[in-house]
Amino acid sequence: MKGATVTQTVNVVQTAADGLIVAPTVFNGVSGEGARIEVKVTTNGTVNVAINDSWMTNVSSRAAMTEQAMAFNVAVNYGTPRTGSITFTLGDLTETVTVHQLAANIPDIGMESNAVELAAKMYAGWNIGNTLEATGGETAWGNPKITEEYIKKIKQLGFNAIRIPCAWDQYIENPATHEIKESWLDRVNEVVGYCVANDMYTIVNIHWDGGWLENNCTPDKQEENNEKQHALWTQIANRLNHYDERLLFAGTNEPNVDNATEMAVLKSYLQTFIDAGRATGGKNAVRNLIVQGPNTDIERTNNLFGEMPTDVVPNRLMAEVHYYTPWS
């Protein structure tokens, strides 16, 4: 600015409409045992934070600051190494932080026990019902989500085996191939990890699941259901293959069978389950598997079941019945 005899310079600093910087943008080798990570966020506005994976949570305060360290908890990972992301948004600006987490170390006790030996090790079992098999989602029937603290409490009460009934049909994202949503496979794996990491024998099944199998042990549905049974068990077995002998697979739940014709169809479903699991190799090549009697009723099983299905591995099959007979 100029006056008659005075000259003065004024510095003008223009602030960007939106500014957003995050650092670091990548976390490598995050402990599988769980960890807390911090992201430095520099901004001139209110940032929206979206965590794109359920195993991370934002534990930061919401103080209005131009620069702050935002903290996130990364849950324990009992599966395989995984990658997630956190997205920061301010106006039209987006920054993404990628998190690579290792797998936690669960001591591996091997796969040496056959069916008789393994059954003898399970002395008290707990069925976690109305959760992972619930129609509409894990909490749809009124129970909270399964946590590791819950599993630890069951163990403290003296139980050493857990049955996890599971729904799968409602989580299929491609009906043509029966492809299961990766997020659901991850969730089941997470719960199995809670159990095995706490030294609990664990049974995973295909439960009622809308009745597509257990209400249709009939010749007209046999081919269609065997295709679906094979596709589902291939995916389940592959996803959980890394667990040792403390994990068992159960092919069905309570298949409704009234006669020899329907029993033959059920046998084919059970054979498909066994063959699909064994074909995935790895630990599943020798994993102990559980097959279900008709209606899981002991009298009907004694009358209709006959010989056990064929298995390429000797002495690795168990038969399942439920305590419904006698009744009044």
Model regions and ranges:
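A short beta-strand micro-motif common to beta-rich folds, especially ectodomain repeats
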Residues: M1-K2, T80-D92
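Short, solvent-exposed loop/turn segments enriched in Ser/Thr/Gly
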Residues: E33-V39, N77-I86
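An active-site-proximal structural segment forming one wall of the substrate-binding cleft
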Residues: G142-N160, T177-W208, W212-G251, V265-G281
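Active-site region of glycoside hydrolase catalytic domains
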Residues: E227-S328
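Solvent-exposed, low-complexity, repeat-rich "mucin-like" stalks and linkers
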Residues: G19-V49
